[in-house]
């Protein structure tokens, strides 16, 4: 196989979203799988909408996701510059080539690309004026995912607007030629443009790259393509919420690609080894935030203890004036560590930590009224609380198993179940019915804080 060169060409006109990240990922994976080159090219010709801030978001997001580019802004390369706003001389040079070949003309102040073929006039859809059509053979697109696609391109099209700026179709093709791109991997929504691009490649006498139009990512609920405005669409949001980039990359790789079996969680090295264009599906992929959350949870579970605690602390630091965050960061490091490790098996993301751990860092927490009514309305909860408080001095708080054994002994003694004591104990120490294991909560909080909290519930 000839050396593969792929490119990712985003526009810095908005925040970096899931669809763009998945397109970048498939290009990056294919380059890494084949030992090729991943080129980052910035399509920043829209002067009114471009933003350096959004450009930096693109750079930061790609790096956060681990998709370092081989050529492009900040890296250089023999085919630069890599920002379209800096390539006007290149576009003028290629325009001159087309003009010299008789393939352009001016109309209404714009420059048009002239298709080859017999011309004829037809009325437009309103039958008010005529439109020039061109008799051409269908343009054949050999797509690595869609197969053979034929489209009829029967109208000339603008390549330079009346304001003197080149249009997307022209700069896209010129840059792919100049940068020797061998494979164009992009969203299916670009398939309708591809016949124009093929005709331009042919007009320049350049080899047509291999095309691979990947499936769209659909909204989680309802029809249509996922857009920047949809919840969960922005990469920056996952960074802010404390998701692991490895989990997001793994999840994105499976949005439209199949490794050939039913595996879902895979290290990036394995994804690179397996990734190839024949494994990309034709059918669109539907975004599923619950699946992503479970994927993230699986990655969190695998983090070494020190790494998890370090990342948890960094997340709390990112919350600024959040009351729980301030209390957590002010706690003794050893206590903070114990609370975090107790929570690690239970959370799907770091964003859950403040609500999940708040009662560890303050004794002044609210009690969930619905949970209270449910727990305190079953049997004789006050009696169970008194029995539990009286038994605490005999509990070994040194480890979870010892605490569990103490509660079991108490339950057996009073002909009750472990859950009968667990429910009132959890309500007393946390004010809710969800959280880490009750035995772990007892161990981390310690005998005196547990006693004080249970007595507060008893006397409420």
Swiss-Prot record:
CDD domains: GluRS_core. It is found in: Cytoplasm. ATP binds at residue 228. Keywords: Aminoacyl-tRNA synthetase, ATP-binding, Cytoplasm, Ligase, Nucleotide-binding, Protein biosynthesis. Its EC number is 6.1.1.17. GO terms for cellular component: cytosol. A motif ('KMSKS' region) lies at residues 225-229. It is an enzyme of class 6 (ligase). Pfam families: Anticodon_2 (PF19269), tRNA-synt_1c (PF00749). The keyword Transferase does not apply. One of its GO terms (biological process) is glutamyl-tRNA aminoacylation. It comes from the Bacteria. It catalyses: tRNA(Glu) + L-glutamate + ATP = L-glutamyl-tRNA(Glu) + AMP + diphosphate. One of its GO terms (molecular function) is tRNA binding. A motif ('HIGH' region) lies at residues 10-20. Catalyzes the attachment of glutamate to tRNA(Glu) in a two-step reaction: glutamate is first activated by ATP to form Glu-AMP and then transferred to the acceptor end of tRNA(Glu). Belongs to the class-I aminoacyl-tRNA synthetase family. Glutamate--tRNA ligase type 1 subfamily. Monomer. This is Glutamate--tRNA ligase. The lineage of its organism: Bacteria, Pseudomonadati, Verrucomicrobiota, Opitutia, Opitutales.
């Amino acid at each position: 196989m000839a050396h593969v060169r792929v490119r990712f060409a985003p526009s810095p006109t908005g925040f970096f979203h899931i669809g763009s990240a998945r397109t970048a990922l498939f290009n990056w994976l294919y380059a890494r799988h084949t030992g090729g080159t991943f080129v980052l090219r910035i399509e920043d010709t829209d002067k009114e909408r471009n933003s350096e801030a959004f450009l930096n978001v693109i750079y930061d997001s790609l790096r956060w996701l681990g998709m370092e580019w081989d050529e492009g802004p900040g890296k250089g390369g023999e085919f630069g510059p890599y920002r379209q706003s800096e390539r006007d001389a290149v576009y003028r040079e290629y325009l001159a080539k087309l003009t010299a070949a008789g393939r352009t003309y001016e109309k209404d102040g714009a420059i048009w690309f002239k298709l080859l073929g017999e011309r004829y006039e037809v009325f437009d859809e309103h039958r008010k004026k005529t439109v020039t059509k061109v008799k051409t053979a269908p343009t054949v697109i050999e797509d690595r995912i869609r197969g053979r696609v034929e489209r009829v391109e029967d109208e000339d099209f603008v390549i330079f607007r009346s304001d003197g700026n080149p249009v997307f179709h022209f700069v896209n093709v010129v840059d792919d030629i100049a940068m020797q791109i061998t494979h164009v991997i992009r969203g299916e929504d670009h398939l309708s443009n591809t016949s124009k691009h093929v005709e331009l490649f042919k007009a320049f006498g350049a080899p047509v790259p291999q095309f691979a139009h990947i499936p769209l990512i659909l909204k989680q609920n309802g029809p249509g393509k996922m857009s920047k405005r949809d919840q969960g669409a922005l990469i920056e949001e996952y960074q802010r919420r404390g998701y692991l980039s490895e989990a997001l990359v793994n999840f994105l790789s499976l949005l439209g690609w199949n490794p050939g079996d039913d595996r879902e969680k895979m290290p990036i090295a394995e994804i690179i080894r397996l990734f190839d264009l024949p494994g990309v599906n034709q059918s669109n992929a539907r975004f599923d935030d619950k699946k992503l959350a479970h994927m993230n949870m699986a990655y969190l579970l695998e983090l070494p203890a020190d790494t998890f605690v370090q990342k948890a602390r960094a997340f709390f630091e990112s919350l600024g004036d959040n009351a729980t965050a301030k209390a957590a960061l002010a706690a003794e490091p050893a206590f903070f560590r114990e609370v975090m490790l107790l929570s690690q098996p239970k959370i799907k993301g770091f964003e859950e930590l403040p609500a999940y751990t708040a009662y560890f860092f303050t004794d002044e927490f609210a009690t969930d009224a619905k949970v209270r009514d449910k727990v305190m309305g079953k049997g004789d909860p006050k009696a169970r609380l008194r029995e539990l408080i009286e038994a605490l001095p005999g509990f070994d708080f040194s480890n979870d198993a010892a605490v569990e054994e103490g509660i079991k002994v108490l339950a057996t003694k009073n002909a009750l179940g472990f859950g009968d004591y667990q429910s009132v104990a959890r309500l007393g120490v946390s004010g809710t019915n969800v959280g880490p294991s009750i035995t772990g909560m007892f161990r981390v909080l310690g005998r005196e804080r547990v006693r004080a909290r249970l007595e507060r519930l008893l006397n409420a």
